Amino acid sequence: MHWILALSLLLLLWLLVASPRLAWLKAGLLSLLLLLLSAWGLVDRLSGDGINAATLYHLRADMDGAGVSDFSGYIAVFIGMVLLSLSPLMLLRVRRFRRPRGGGAVFGAFVVMLLVSMAVSPVYRDGKRLYYQLRPVDYATVVPEYQVPQQPLQKRKNIVWIYGESLERTYFDEATFPGLMPNLRQLATEAVDVRNLTSTEGSGWTIAGMVASMCGVPLTTAPGDENSMGRMGLFLPEARCLGDYLKDQGYRNHYVGGADASFAGKGSFLASHGFDVVHDVNYFHDKGVAPKHFSAWGVHDDVLLDDAWESFQTLSRAGQPFMLTTLTMDTHHPAGHLPLACKNQRYESPLGDIGLLHAIKCSDRLIGELVTRIRNSRYGRNTIIVIASDHLAMPNDLSDVLAKQKRENLLLFLGKDIPPQQVVRRAGSTLDSGATLLQLLEPGMRTLGFGRSLLANDAPPSASVAASRDSGRDYPRYLAYARTLWTGRSTRMLRVNGNGDVVVGVQQVRPPVLLEYDDDTNLKTVYLENTSRQFDRTHSDGTLAYVDRCTAFEDGSADGDWCALVVDRNQHMKLYRDPDLTRGIAVDAPLDVTPQAPRPRVRQPIMLTQAARKTEAGRYMLELYAKRRPTRAFWVEAVSSERKVVLAQQWVVPDASGRIRMPVGLEHAVEDLGIRAWLDYTEEVSVDDLALVKDTAVADRS
């Protein structure tokens, strides 16, 4: 396919210069195609699998804490490709066209080759794959397969779960990586060593690998944009995970990780599913750990695993059963990091002096030392240790080598009463890790979510089997069911709670939010980004429900209350106000059939202040100048409490110079005062100057 794409691009370039007819249109289309391919190339270098579920997840999830500097080389190449993608536009400025005839035929051929290029491009392939994975499907047949543990534990052993970042079992291959991981290879001979463990769709990145192994479900975007972690109150609230079950059994769940817990919603996941303590990079900063012990991603593994050992001792002495979970970081792609404890440790390899190999060698030693400490302690006899890769390695400095190997995840179980054995399964994935641990804790337990114990010879149907059979034809059913775990299945009632969050099923979402229902009033899509634009452009066969401040819908609203605009398939509309939303509204209730005006263009809030400011009580005059502004009047508000409380509001019309004046009265001091405007998505405002002047006399005259 690659050679066909390359040939198609060359033909497109020739057809561009073959005729001057519609030359700028052809150049623009070719540049757009090249930009798409460049963007795909960057994403593929980061994900290792093109545009997939991980890409969609991270586009919406909180990216704070990502070690962006590690990928500066990829980004530099991408910038170069972007500039190269614009070359067709530049070519028209230097090329003199000498063939004035045949323009129509040339343009027709150009369009055909453009379609061919798209059809053979990886962008189309990935788009088609995502469509089949995320399209609405009937998941009813797999609902009985989702099982949660109910049986009480007879023996409550302590658990230490060590996730090795991208530390797949493939690195055990002595022929390719001789002597790279002697400690974990030795531990594998003393453990239940699971082989052929794959990562299914929805489990191939860190948070997804944790969700898959601890909940037995793939992590997939909720319908639409619910994976905007900052806007979701709960992380997979309908899932029942290992942490939830163990907490009910009297366990204390403790997590210590070196990265920022807010990255990709990891902290939200842990807090939502039974973890009592979540320590991340900020914990180590607060402890006063020296800067030399941090990388772009967080604290190094030597400091992290020392802290894990201290936590193990503290938790063990307390006498309460516990699960201690830790996640290493220094083997993160693309090149890894080396902590101070391993600065003098090198790995000699025929592959060359590769930093990632040094990092893997170090991780093997540090994890091995922690495991030895735990097993040799007086608490080791009552402890099960799990050593697992969170996912297969993403593109890194060893990708070309790994591509030639049989890839498999790492999963080891060690414990006093666990006889060593190598378990080989034809269809096993990280979805089955938690269920396998449960069987080791309690032999009669063999399921967790869609996961099945890999020790059971009579395991019932599972998502792992579905993913490996018939090219994964039935696997989208499991993905579809997993998406319902974000909101639940009873989503036809909407209400706004006392915190100003929209309650949808079991989920709480911070507005604005646009919900799209199908013709049977089943929740189809939830939009949390660009909601105003989405509302204007979405023409549904079902019902739309848009929830935001009444200011978004009405010119005459000045109360800051919540409203919901519901539009049915016949374009009948009804605006529900705050009292209705407090009680709750049914989106499938009949709407008035009186003649309706055209669907309004809904406004959205745009912050005019760059940062919130602390402001004392008093009367103020807000003065701002905006050279670029809407041609019509619009709302300006002063807000506080994370933009939830409206302190002042005015329907403003800038004067000829763009000046806006609005009185603001504060009865008490405000810690986070901000100024925002309400505009529709086609409008914009650019503030050149803004001042909040405390002047009682001026405020009174206004």
From Swiss-Prot:
Keywords: Cell inner membrane, Cell membrane, Membrane, Transferase, Transmembrane, Transmembrane helix
Pfam family, one: Sulfatase
Principal location: membrane
Localization annotation: Cell inner membrane
GO function terms (MF aspect): phosphatidylglycerol-membrane-oligosaccharide glycerophosphotransferase activity
InterPro entries: Alkaline_phosphatase_core_sf, OpgB, OpgB/LTA_synthase_biosynth, Sulfatase_N
Family, as annotated: Belongs to the OpgB family.
Protein name: Phosphoglycerol transferase I
Organism expressing this protein natively: Xanthomonas campestris pv. campestris (strain B100)
Lineage, highest ranks first: Bacteria, Pseudomonadati, Pseudomonadota, Gammaproteobacteria, Lysobacterales
Gene coding for it: opgB
